[in-house]
Amino acid sequence: MNIQQGKVWKFGENIDTDLIIAARYLNTSDPQVLASHVMEDARPDFLQHFTKGDFIVAGENFGCGSSREHAPVALKTAGVSAVIAKSFARIFYRNSFNTGLPILEVKETDEIREGDTLEVDMAQGTIKNLTRNQTYAFKPIPPFMMELLESGGLIEHAKAKIAQGVL
Protein backbone atom coordinates (compact mmCIF):
# COMPACT_ATOMS: atom_id res chain seq x y z
CA MET A 1 0.00 0.00 0.00
CA ASN A 2 2.93 2.36 0.50
CA ILE A 3 3.50 3.56 -3.09
CA GLN A 4 0.67 3.80 -5.61
CA GLN A 5 0.61 5.21 -9.12
CA GLY A 6 -2.35 6.17 -11.26
CA LYS A 7 -4.14 8.75 -13.36
CA VAL A 8 -6.08 11.75 -12.02
CA TRP A 9 -9.84 12.21 -12.28
CA LYS A 10 -10.53 15.81 -11.33
CA PHE A 11 -13.66 17.05 -9.58
CA GLY A 12 -14.58 20.41 -8.06
CA GLU A 13 -15.67 21.73 -4.69
CA ASN A 14 -18.39 20.35 -2.41
CA ILE A 15 -18.71 16.94 -4.04
CA ASP A 16 -21.45 15.49 -1.88
CA THR A 17 -22.28 11.89 -1.14
CA ASP A 18 -25.26 12.03 -3.55
CA LEU A 19 -22.80 12.72 -6.39
CA ILE A 20 -20.51 9.92 -5.23
CA ILE A 21 -23.34 7.37 -5.02
CA ALA A 22 -26.89 8.49 -5.74
CA ALA A 23 -29.60 7.90 -3.14
CA ARG A 24 -31.50 5.67 -5.59
CA TYR A 25 -28.83 2.99 -4.99
CA LEU A 26 -28.98 3.04 -1.21
CA ASN A 27 -31.38 0.11 -1.15
CA THR A 28 -28.38 -2.20 -1.57
CA SER A 29 -25.30 -2.73 0.53
CA ASP A 30 -23.58 -4.89 -2.10
CA PRO A 31 -20.19 -3.20 -2.67
CA GLN A 32 -20.00 -4.38 -6.31
CA VAL A 33 -23.40 -2.90 -7.15
CA LEU A 34 -22.45 0.37 -5.46
CA ALA A 35 -19.12 0.46 -7.31
CA SER A 36 -20.88 -0.01 -10.64
CA HIS A 37 -22.67 3.33 -10.10
CA VAL A 38 -19.94 5.39 -8.44
CA MET A 39 -19.74 9.03 -9.61
CA GLU A 40 -22.32 8.47 -12.36
CA ASP A 41 -24.37 11.56 -11.45
CA ALA A 42 -21.23 13.73 -11.36
CA ARG A 43 -19.80 12.28 -14.57
CA PRO A 44 -21.95 9.69 -16.37
CA ASP A 45 -19.04 8.21 -18.36
CA PHE A 46 -16.67 7.98 -15.37
CA LEU A 47 -16.53 4.18 -15.13
CA GLN A 48 -16.16 3.79 -18.90
CA HIS A 49 -12.73 5.45 -18.71
CA PHE A 50 -11.62 4.93 -15.09
CA THR A 51 -8.91 2.35 -14.43
CA LYS A 52 -8.49 0.61 -11.09
CA GLY A 53 -5.69 2.33 -9.23
CA ASP A 54 -6.52 5.83 -10.46
CA PHE A 55 -7.01 8.79 -8.11
CA ILE A 56 -9.84 11.22 -7.54
CA VAL A 57 -8.63 14.78 -6.92
CA ALA A 58 -11.04 17.47 -5.73
CA GLY A 59 -11.31 20.81 -3.99
CA GLU A 60 -12.80 21.69 -0.61
CA ASN A 61 -15.34 19.70 1.39
CA PHE A 62 -15.28 16.39 -0.51
CA GLY A 63 -17.91 13.98 0.82
CA CYS A 64 -20.26 16.57 2.28
CA GLY A 65 -23.98 15.96 2.55
CA SER A 66 -25.66 12.99 4.12
CA SER A 67 -23.72 10.52 6.21
CA ARG A 68 -23.56 7.32 4.24
CA GLU A 69 -20.94 4.65 4.40
CA HIS A 70 -22.01 3.65 0.89
CA ALA A 71 -19.95 6.51 -0.62
CA PRO A 72 -16.44 5.43 0.49
CA VAL A 73 -17.39 1.77 0.00
CA ALA A 74 -18.36 2.49 -3.62
CA LEU A 75 -15.10 4.39 -4.28
CA LYS A 76 -12.92 1.74 -2.66
CA THR A 77 -14.65 -1.18 -4.39
CA ALA A 78 -14.44 0.60 -7.76
CA GLY A 79 -10.66 0.64 -7.28
CA VAL A 80 -9.93 4.26 -6.40
CA SER A 81 -6.39 4.25 -4.91
CA ALA A 82 -7.07 7.37 -2.86
CA VAL A 83 -9.14 10.52 -2.82
CA ILE A 84 -6.98 13.64 -2.69
CA ALA A 85 -8.74 16.87 -1.75
CA LYS A 86 -8.17 20.21 -0.07
CA SER A 87 -10.54 19.13 2.72
CA PHE A 88 -13.11 16.49 3.57
CA ALA A 89 -16.43 16.51 5.38
CA ARG A 90 -15.69 15.09 8.83
CA ILE A 91 -18.12 12.16 8.68
CA PHE A 92 -16.83 11.18 5.22
CA TYR A 93 -13.28 11.39 6.58
CA ARG A 94 -14.10 8.95 9.38
CA ASN A 95 -16.19 6.64 7.20
CA SER A 96 -13.33 6.45 4.69
CA PHE A 97 -10.83 5.19 7.23
CA ASN A 98 -13.43 2.84 8.72
CA THR A 99 -13.99 1.28 5.30
CA GLY A 100 -10.31 1.28 4.27
CA LEU A 101 -10.36 4.06 1.66
CA PRO A 102 -7.23 6.27 1.77
CA ILE A 103 -7.98 9.99 1.76
CA LEU A 104 -5.28 12.65 1.64
CA GLU A 105 -5.58 16.35 2.41
CA VAL A 106 -3.46 18.43 0.04
CA LYS A 107 -3.80 22.19 -0.37
CA GLU A 108 -2.28 22.27 -3.89
CA THR A 109 -5.03 20.33 -5.67
CA ASP A 110 -5.55 23.28 -8.05
CA GLU A 111 -2.11 22.51 -9.52
CA ILE A 112 -3.12 18.93 -10.37
CA ARG A 113 -4.90 18.45 -13.70
CA GLU A 114 -7.23 15.83 -15.12
CA GLY A 115 -5.17 13.04 -16.67
CA ASP A 116 -1.95 13.78 -14.76
CA THR A 117 -0.11 10.73 -13.47
CA LEU A 118 0.56 10.72 -9.74
CA GLU A 119 2.77 8.60 -7.53
CA VAL A 120 1.63 8.59 -3.90
CA ASP A 121 4.01 7.47 -1.17
CA MET A 122 1.91 6.88 1.93
CA ALA A 123 4.92 6.27 4.17
CA GLN A 124 6.75 9.45 3.14
CA GLY A 125 3.65 11.62 2.93
CA THR A 126 4.41 12.76 -0.62
CA ILE A 127 2.62 12.95 -3.93
CA LYS A 128 4.74 13.22 -7.07
CA ASN A 129 3.01 14.62 -10.11
CA LEU A 130 4.99 12.72 -12.74
CA THR A 131 3.32 14.67 -15.56
CA ARG A 132 4.24 18.12 -14.22
CA ASN A 133 7.40 17.21 -12.28
CA GLN A 134 5.97 18.62 -9.03
CA THR A 135 5.86 17.20 -5.52
CA TYR A 136 3.25 17.91 -2.86
CA ALA A 137 3.31 16.96 0.80
CA PHE A 138 0.42 15.73 2.86
CA LYS A 139 0.13 15.36 6.59
CA PRO A 140 1.29 11.84 7.46
CA ILE A 141 -1.52 9.50 8.38
CA PRO A 142 -1.40 8.59 12.10
CA PRO A 143 -0.19 5.03 12.82
CA PHE A 144 -3.58 3.71 13.99
CA MET A 145 -5.30 5.11 10.90
CA MET A 146 -2.63 3.46 8.71
CA GLU A 147 -3.37 0.18 10.49
CA LEU A 148 -7.03 0.58 9.56
CA LEU A 149 -6.15 1.21 5.91
CA GLU A 150 -3.69 -1.68 5.76
CA SER A 151 -6.27 -4.01 7.33
CA GLY A 152 -8.96 -2.97 4.85
CA GLY A 153 -11.02 -1.00 7.36
CA LEU A 154 -12.20 -1.06 10.95
CA ILE A 155 -14.14 -4.34 10.81
CA GLU A 156 -11.26 -6.25 9.20
CA HIS A 157 -8.86 -4.66 11.67
CA ALA A 158 -11.01 -5.79 14.61
CA LYS A 159 -11.31 -9.32 13.17
CA ALA A 160 -7.51 -9.53 12.90
CA LYS A 161 -7.07 -8.31 16.49
CA ILE A 162 -9.60 -10.87 17.74
CA ALA A 163 -7.81 -13.63 15.82
CA GLN A 164 -4.53 -12.55 17.45
CA GLY A 165 -6.19 -12.64 20.87
CA VAL A 166 -5.62 -8.92 21.37
CA LEU A 167 -9.34 -8.05 21.62
Curated annotation (Swiss-Prot):
Its EC number is 4.2.1.33. One of its GO terms (molecular function) is 3-isopropylmalate dehydratase activity. Keywords: Amino-acid biosynthesis, Branched-chain amino acid biosynthesis, Leucine biosynthesis, Lyase. Pfam families: Aconitase_C (PF00694). Pathway: Amino-acid biosynthesis; L-leucine biosynthesis; L-leucine from 3-methyl-2-oxobutanoate: step 2/4. Heterodimer of LeuC and LeuD. This is 3-isopropylmalate dehydratase small subunit. It comes from Wolinella succinogenes (strain ATCC 29543 / DSM 1740 / CCUG 13145 / JCM 31913 / LMG 7466 / NCTC 11488 / FDC 602W).
